[in-house]
Structures are given as structure tokens and as C-alpha cells.
Swiss-Prot record:
Belongs to the AB hydrolase superfamily. AB hydrolase 2 family. GO terms for cellular component: cytoplasm; nucleus. Pfam families: Abhydrolase_2 (PF02230). This is Acyl-protein thioesterase 1. It comes from the Eukaryota. It comes from Emericella nidulans (strain FGSC A4 / ATCC 38163 / CBS 112.46 / NRRL 194 / M139).
Amino acid sequence: MSRAPFIVPALKKHTATVIMAHGLGDSGAGWVSLAHNWRRRGLFEEVTFIFPNAPMIPITVNFGMSMPGWYDITKLGRDLDFQEAVKNQDEAGILKSRDYFNSLIKEQMDQGIKPSRIVLGGFSQGGAMSLFSGITGQEKLGGVFGLSCYMLLSDRIKNYIPENFPNKKTPFFLAHGTEDDIVPHEFGKRSAEMAKELGLEDVTFNSYKYLSHSADPVEIEDLEKFLDRVIPAENGGSL
């Protein structure tokens, strides 16, 4: 069972929500500084930031030992082929985490936040889950972002897309470092191409030279611009 998410509440009237999911072995606390940095700069003051915590589950690449994860991973690394990575993915774990992400979205909707004012995103595993959840989701979101991530269940994701494809026109922002030795840059690039092939009409893929499996200031600045575009301030001034 997951621990409760870390929440950074809006400073002004709450009009939008960003859900940011961490990567394998991390926790929501690992990304809270992102929201605090924006707070210090007077940005996104209408936004509540939610940083969920993955449950402790056995992870195959961790010799079967438990660690925080949104789903099990059997293989990892620069030498992994994209098609090979698709095989033996933890479909049950992925769907379970998608249901959890959907419950977080519903909680925000129950609080009066329109789905068009909700952004779902994450880093690595969290980004992969956000990409999958956004593509297969029942609600039209304001935006979806994934940093250093890849497309999950790419050989069968079509089976999970609702017939009316709510997020067909939703903006998607994908970003990846060229020197990523955990999730190869090619995975991110291929995933962006696949997203377009699935019918997504607003997909941005940014590459960052010399960046490994992490985030950097330029990438975060681009994410900042993306958020400002998809959930602009409603009450005047900066979000």
C-alpha cells in the first residue's frame, strides 16, 4: 500500500493541479523541491502540487528485493533493445498504478478542479506511468509530461485507449537526455513517435545534450513553459 502523497497546496485560489510521479526507488519527497522552487519565484500560485509515493514492491532488476516502484522491471540499461524492453512488462502492476493515478485525478475533480486544469506527469517510471495513463485515460486532461521515460505496453496500448480517445488533442511534453544510461534516449524518441502514430495531435519531444538519467535546469525551464501554456493563470498574474 502506498503512503499518502506529499502535497504542496496552492497559495491563491486553487484552480489547477499538477500530479508529479517519481521514478523507481525514489519517493514523492524527491521532487517536492520543484514546487518549492516555483513558489520562491512566485510561479504557479494557483496550482496544488501532488507528489504520490509508489508502493514497496519486489523489483526483478533489484534481485527481487522490494523498493518503491509503480511496476516491476525485469531489464534495464543502455544496451537494452526497445523491442526487448516491451516483452515481459508488468501489465498487472502498470494497470494497478494507472487505477491509482486515476483515483488521484478523481479526487481533484471531486474538489471542483476541472480535468482540463489537471496535469499528469513524472520522471522515469513515473513519467512512463503518466504517459500510459494519459493516453488511456477517460478524462481529457490539461496536459501530460514525461521526463526520461518511455511508452509502456506499446505492443498493446491500443487495446486500452477509450473509443472516444479523450486525450487525442491534449498536449504531451516528453523530454530526454542524450546520455541517459538507464532509459536510453532512443526509447524516449521512439515513444514520442509512437504517441503520434497512436493519433495524439500535440506531442513535443525535447532532447538535452550530455544529460544523463536526471533533470537539468534547461529541461525544467521548458517544463515550466509547458505548464504555463496548458494551465494558464485564471485569476490574473502568474499561475
